């Protein structure tokens, strides 16, 4: 179909994963904010 998302949203831990995937936070920040 050729569809490409403009962005990704998340909820709860999904927000952390989204921020990491989009390059907004580092891996260390993602791990620390999840715990």
Swiss-Prot record:
EC number: 2.3.1.85
Molecular function via GO: fatty acid synthase activity; hydrolase activity
Biological processes annotated in GO: fatty acid biosynthetic process
Active-site residues annotated for this sequence: 12
Cysteine disulfide partners in this protein: none
Residues annotated as transmembrane: none
An annotated GO cellular component: melanosome
Coiled-coil portions: none
Subcellular location as annotated: Cytoplasm; Melanosome
Top-level EC class as recorded in UniProt: transferase
Entry-linked SUPFAM superfamilies: FabD/lysophospholipase-like
UniProt keywords, alphabetically: Cytoplasm, Fatty acid biosynthesis, Fatty acid metabolism, Hydrolase, Lipid biosynthesis, Lipid metabolism, Multifunctional enzyme, NAD, NADP, Transferase
Main location: cytoplasm
Subunit structure: Homodimer which is arranged in a head to tail fashion. Interacts with CEACAM1; this interaction is insulin and phosphorylation-dependent; reduces fatty-acid synthase activity.
Protein name per the record: Fatty acid synthase
Organism, scientific name: Capra hircus
